[in-house]
Amino acid sequence: MKDLIIDLVSSPTPLATVAEQKNLSLRSAVYMQVAHYLRRSRKVLTSPTQYKLLKGQKEFGYATVGLNLAPATEAYFLTRVNMCPSASKGCLATCLRHSGQNIFTQGKIARIARTVLWLEFRPEFLAIVGAEVR
């Protein structure tokens, strides 16, 4: 998996757009998204202009960004890692991945891609997030 993503990053071929990613297999779409993150053509952290994050900024005066990773076994087919190993059945049933914008395919692709980035490209993940926070 890691080698395929590195090949995508170093390839001169343009990466798939969000609209094009929807037509790919989930695995291919995730690889493409991770490559976008590594090329820094897409942000890892969610925008502080997102409604719920903006509300907190207005209340407390601090810019807030979000980072949603794949919960429990959502990314297991690629990572073989359970991100929520201690989650109860109740927690899994009420997980926020089942609500709001999280239910859409692009959100799922992004969550899994961020999780792959965290697990497989940790130094790069930390550098990217550090740069985005600054």
Language-model-detected regions and their locations in the chain:
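Class I S-adenosyl-L-methionine
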Residues: 1-134
